[in-house]
């Protein structure tokens, strides 16, 4: 209670914290740029980049602070003015109402968020935002970003908690030359920027040398080649799109030779992890960030956007990317507006007489169905009111909606119709089902469902050079359960792929190989051109004994280990990073550092389950099962309904010969997470082991109905039915198991400790 009382005092008594501007001499500021580039500055003014973040003033605040009230989760918040300040009375970190001053606005349309200063240099994003859309569109109102969830002060999504912290979650992409400056010892921030918004040098890089070149200052000649710019964005220079009458689609006059522009945009328009202490303009994206693959929960099996993944991952899947299209082919890079309104931007390259006709789209002119974007870039709403378009430019596939439940553009408009109706319409129009480029939905759906027969289709996908690299990288990341001689060959090829994302994904799989083979394959990757590959290689080699390597190899490994540590310290305020450090220290035998890292993760976010589970597993590995159990019970006391914790506790109790208590915990885990075939299987085995074979069989039969291709469940059904004398049932399950086993024939892998959870 003392801690919260002190904190409440601070909340009520501090003055607004101003974030300092950084005046590093290599960043010169927009005004200097505008002295030569006035036209570009004019386009940029009032753009979303210009208005990305602003001090809260009467000119910048869009929300109604006239005493308006808004109620969510039982808390009524009031927005009001106090002299020239904008204030909100709402629930704070202790759940009590208090008055907070709005320090900054964040964004402008279709919503505007507000930032509040807290001790330790923190800015927190209020969970209630202003709907900036016109009133006739439902806007001009306060709304909660999680309208269907009861977000109270003890929830991880509450506005005062870590996941709504501006410094670590938002700041880098809303200001120029943002330096987070987190101090792990003080657990505080000294965040600085060169400019508050996304200005010229956010994209073009520091301009001091460019100014020296332009003004012919002493030594300017040495910068003449790139005009003093670290980021040279010239991929469209001297390029035109040549119409092709036979296809109706224009072709780039020369191949795109680099990806500087796309990667520059991807820095903020991608779902990614930070892997370096400081971004350097002009260096490869994967030297500083690791973009998410087409993972479950992030993307649908066919690659359509699902979670808030922005646009980079979807664009990499597209024919546009393969054809050499860059972001600025469609978007004017200063105003951010489309180069032509509506379908006009598409018709720059796609002939209107071929594509803007009913013969192509089968809809009335000027209807939504005749819009290129509505059909090929269907939107998905984020932050309640912000529709964002999928940039994979795909052919609508309602047939996949029928078989896999993925969304499709047709039913976005035709909400009253079924997916089968839409699929039949497409079949009637074309006489077949147009496939498009993205043909991996069935494969990824199978791997996500644990289908043991999915291995062969994964290999086919990986081997197809026409498949976008991000899909091949995703497939390689899913090879683990299907490792055999064939897939090992594909893995080895992936390590030397031209695409760094493919190499990084493949390198991450090496930890599942036997130690000797892993060392043989991973050592050369410590010298890869990009950091993302090097740190994955180092992580996979972290447990290799020093004596197994020569001096040069050991030096390379130590360098890679340090790069990995630095990559995690770049997000030291996050529990995921601290958990990853703990895992590394365990592999390295640095036990005190491992325990400290896990405990730091828990301190940063007591609701972060992997840190608790890994700390308990750390104690188990030291033969301190009592400490492991105590850790898990402490976690469960603070978090109700977390399956992973009950499962880990059940295993701990089994190791302590407390079988009856273990069954209770394992049952709880299986109940809380009925989608986990592993939890249900282990629960059934525990029932059988405690003399409850009939109950075990009932659980297994139910599990088999849900997971018909799970070989562990089938194997247990064979064994348990034989034990019960059910020969017919045992034989039936055995035949099915045998039919699946050849496809699931595993490569003999070195068991990575499956109880240790990586931070995400």
Predicted regions and their residues:
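Amphipathic alpha-helical scaffolding segments comprising HEAT/armadillo-like alpha-solenoid repeats
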Residues: 452-462, 484-496, 514-526, 548-565
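Helix-start (N-cap) detector for alpha-helical repeat units in TPR-like alpha-solenoids
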Residues: 469, 500-503, 531, 575-576, ...
